């Protein structure tokens, strides 16, 4: 069974892209045809619009990018209908040949961590849950024993996790940059990530434990690429948050793989951007999504 890291790096090389399209549906920003389809903001109606929106994005970017990243929170806020929608979106992405990284930032210890992992990791039958994804973002705050249950499920299901190491938000440094015993917290987390990977490397030297490192901190991105040579990096903060193409190239290995760069708003709401003209009724919004994806691919190639 091909490991998660092997699958993702192969998809990067196959598509010639390191772009990860973030699926963050927001009702007020949906294209007009989808906003108009929502009945009195009923949650089941909003969920149906989210499913259609995300699935049409998937259809627009399939073959152009290696992966998509649905943000679980936007679906969870709709209750049961939203969770059904999330499952439908994940399944559609799998069927389209895209790797799915669910952004849930889960964490706990023992059996609860295993339950989270069972719910969100593994896209292959017979183990697949309704939300079974190829990878999941996780928090390291509870320590090593909170990550090990996720890694054990990754081993069984050829899945992956992305551990929050140095995040792109301005307030992340409040904890992540604290120094303890001569090392910052993010450096200690990076060491843990590398340790968890060491016995799990594929032929290219990558393990199932990836890391989230923000493009908004380019010096730390260079530092952490060296500190975690066995981890695929998930790099948020490109575009809307200010990270540049030059900044994020440092995350990639010599083959142009080893990292994926996330963009959500700049792609999925591209119909709102003046440079991508769409019809007045926004009926061709999918064209803007595709054009924005191609633009980002070209920017990252340099």
From Swiss-Prot:
SMART domains recorded: OMPdecase (SM00934)
Annotated transmembrane regions: none
PROSITE patterns noted in UniProt: OMPDECASE (PS00156)
Pathway named in the protein's UniProt entry: Pyrimidine metabolism; UMP biosynthesis via de novo pathway; UMP from orotate: step 2/2
Gene3D superfamilies: Aldolase class I (3.20.20.70)
Database matches in InterPro entries: Aldolase_TIM, OMPdecase_AS, OMPdecase_type-2, OMPdeCOase_dom, RibuloseP-bd_barrel
Assigned EC number: 4.1.1.23
Keywords attached to this entry: Decarboxylase, Lyase, Pyrimidine biosynthesis
Positions of the catalytic residues: 105 (proton donor)
GO biological process: 'de novo' pyrimidine nucleobase biosynthetic process; 'de novo' UMP biosynthetic process
Catalysed transformations (reactions): orotidine 5'-phosphate + H(+) = UMP + CO2
Class of enzymatic activity (EC top level): lyase
One GO MF term: orotidine-5'-phosphate decarboxylase activity
Family that this chain belongs to: Belongs to the OMP decarboxylase family. Type 2 subfamily.
HAMAP family the UniProt entry points to: OMPdecase_type2
Protein's recorded name: Orotidine 5'-phosphate decarboxylase
Protein's gene: pyrF
């Amino acid at each position: 069974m091909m490991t998660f890291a092997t699958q993702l790096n192969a998809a990067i090389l196959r598509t010639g892209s390191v772009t990860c399209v973030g699926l963050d549906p927001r009702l007020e920003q949906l294209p007009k045809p989808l906003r108009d389809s929502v009945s009195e903001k009923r949650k089941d109606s909003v969920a149906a619009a989210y499913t259609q929106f995300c699935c049409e994005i998937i259809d627009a970017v399939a073959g152009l990018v290696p992966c998509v990243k649905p943000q679980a929170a936007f679906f969870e806020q709709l209750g049961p209908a939203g969770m059904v929608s999330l499952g439908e979106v994940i399944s559609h992405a799998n069927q389209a040949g895209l790797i799915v990284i669910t952004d849930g930032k889960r964490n706990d210890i023992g059996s609860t961590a295993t339950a989270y992992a069972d719910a969100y990791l593994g896209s292959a039958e017979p183990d697949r849950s309704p939300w079974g994804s190829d990878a999941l973002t996780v928090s390291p705050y509870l320590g090593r024993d909170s990550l090990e249950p996720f890694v054990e499920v990754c081993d069984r299901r050829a899945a992956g996790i992305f551990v929050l190491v140095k995040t792109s938000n301005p307030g992340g440094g409040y904890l992540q940059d604290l120094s303890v015993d001569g090392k910052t917290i993010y450096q200690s987390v990076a060491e843990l990530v590398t340790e968890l990977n060491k016995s799990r490397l594929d032929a290219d030297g990558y393990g199932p434990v990836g890391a989230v490192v923000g493009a908004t901190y380019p010096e730390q991105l260079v530092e952490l690429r060296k500190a975690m040579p066995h981890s695929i990096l998930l790099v948020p903060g490109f575009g809307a948050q200010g990270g540049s193409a030059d900044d994020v190239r440092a995350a990639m290995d010599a083959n142009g793989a080893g990292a994926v760069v996330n963009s959500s708003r700049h792609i999925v709401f591209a119909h709102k951007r003046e440079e991508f003209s769409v019809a007045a009724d926004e009926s061709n919004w999918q064209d803007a999504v595709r054009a924005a994806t191609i633009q980002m691919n070209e920017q990252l190639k340099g």
